Amino acid sequence: MTRKIAVVFEGNYTNRYGGFNAVINRVVSLRAIADYAIDVYMIQVYDKGLTRLRRESTPASERPAAIEVEGVKIVMWWVERSWLDSLGHRMLGLSPTVMLGRLRALSARLRDYDIVSAHDRLAAHVALEAGRRYGMPVFFSWHGASIYTDPVEDRMIRRCTVELLKSPTCNFFVSEGLVREAHKLTPHFKYEILLNGAPPQFHRYSAAERHRLRSRLGVEDCKVVAYAGRFEPVKNVLWLPDIFHRIALKYDGRVVFWTMGSGWQSDHVKRGFDDSGIDYKMWGKVAPERMPELFNCVDVLVLPSRLEGFPLVTIEALACGANAVAADTVSTAEGIGRDNVFVLDDDFIDNISSRAAEMLARHIDQPLPEACSCAATAKKENEIYQRYLTKLPKNQ
């Protein structure tokens, strides 16, 4: 009898960024090597009425029942944010009791599964309640901000996260660095490391393909330096104009600078690019399906983020043959090497631009770590599940 796994995560179907893509990669890779029936559910929180007015949020233009991404059907679970929760949390630091009730009610939909795999905090609440009600093993995957940002900035979230870390059959973390951050919250939890990996579509094209692609995009006779990600403060994107300008000064050759992504700070960054006089192109929000071809044109990826868990974007860039430099945050060195990450101090912009210019000037080997493989991660995930499934009766 085929075992059934439910994968639950929180996301936004209109914004497919790192965590969203990491979940899909895990599902696709596990399906490829193991005979599981895997169903995927996404929690999308929405505002309406008083909550939308207070948060100045924009309502979703539509609320689909399901979407499909990379051949994976995702059933949508739409959960309304409560204005009582928002007020109680804002004024008194209270737990969101209405939201928690709505999440726990969703657990009834998971009663027939053998395993529930949840990604980050909201999904973990659903999975934990399902495990308590129906007795199946539950696994929580942690990707970044839900460990190193939210619990640090909010006492209520810290208490909640500590409870969740202690509760599942096992926690999965995307890096050793993220485990160290979690241990700052509590030393007591079970865990395994499941590194992010680049899916097969992210690979280095042939020399002929790359030449045709670069010619079509107008960068056949120059180097390309890029940033890929959201345009918001935690990403330090306002530093990009200065970083790119210094790279242009330090490299003796033509350089074009690209950005891929969107966010409320993009206009500020564009003005900085205009003032610096660099040659640039801002692609805006790029469909994930197109990222492999753009990365195959990139020579160096720059990631100055203030905080990152284990940035999937750097792994995808390396898989396509680009070099990568980044700020020395939670786990960036695990993916791109200690020599290519730099402390966020007064010398950061000078240091990261110098390393990027060096990479443009001469070949620097920067191999993708063997462990950063979707296949390797799927193999390990399957082995962990099998240890627990062998203890369960069929059709429990």
Where are these regions (language model features)?
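Conserved donor-binding/catalytic core segment of Leloir-type glycosyltransferases
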Residues: A6, V219-K235, P241-F244, W258
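Short His-centered aromatic/hydrophobic patch
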Residues: A118-A123
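Carbohydrate-associated surface elements
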Residues: G177, G197
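Nucleotide-activated donor-binding/catalytic signature segment of Leloir-type glycosyltransferases, i.e.
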Residues: V269-V286
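Short alpha-helical donor nucleotide-sugar binding micro-motif in glycosyltransferases
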Residues: K285, E293-V298
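Aromatic "clamp/platform" in nucleotide-sugar-dependent glycosyltransferases that forms part
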Residues: R306
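Short hydrophobic beta-strand element within catalytic cores of glycosyltransferases
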Residues: N323-A326, A333
